Amino acid sequence: MATKIFVLLALLALSVSTTTAVIIPQCSLAPNAIISQFLPPLTPVGFEHPALQAYRLQQALANSILQQPFAQLQQQSSAHLTVQTIAAQQQQQQFLPALSQLALANPVAYLQQQLLASNPLALVNNAAYQQQQLQQVLPMISQVAMANPAAYLQQQQLAYNPLVAANAAAYLRQQQLQQILPALSQLALVNPAAYLHTQLLPFNQLAVTNTAAYLQQQQLLRVNPVVAANPLCAAFLQPRQLLPFNQISLMNPAFSWQQPIVGSAIV
């Protein structure tokens, strides 16, 4: 009998413990849910685990950054672009005097510099830009070299000649003289009289003032065999050849023959 009473008490105690274990958590969560609706959101956070608190703070910070107004970001980017534009204008104003002087001194170099600034490849990689320009010029250079090797070599020497940059007229005169000198040397070997004649030609006033009279005079001098044999006699025999065209010789031949002798005696 006593054992039955003891078993009933034990069963009653177990039933009470199970009911409290199930009911108490349900009753304990209800006040927290109700209180969290009326209290600030930071109040229940204080009862949470520290790791969970840090995670929720990180999420709140990320949401605040993502929810930043787009207009503010756009305003910052426009301000940055404005600063860059002002800096570029200041640099351009600094370089404008130098560019204007370059345009007056060498227009070709100025245009090349303008094209260089507008080429994105030149801004990124100057070596690649120079190689590209060289590839564009190489076909034309190869064609010139195959068609006329002498002109190609002259063009290469022209690029590295300081006389061309300093004085183009003196360079052209020098080139003409170098081209004429071989012909003059051959003429001096073959016909010394003609060579002396070409040397005296720049100093002849008649050839400069009246070319027709000078040519007529030369044709008359060629008829005389003495002049062909000895060009130095041309100065003395030249008036004799022009006697038919001299009015003094027609009026007084004796005085015409005497006049050069008197002149030479005076000299």
Swiss-Prot record:
The keyword NAD does not apply. Residues 1-21 form the signal peptide. It comes from the Eukaryota. Keywords: Seed storage protein, Signal, Storage protein. GO terms for molecular function: nutrient reservoir activity. Belongs to the zein family. Major seed storage prolamin. PANTHER family: ALPHA KAFIRIN (PTHR48199:SF1). This is Kafirin PSKR2. The lineage of its organism: Eukaryota, Viridiplantae, Streptophyta, Embryophyta, Tracheophyta.
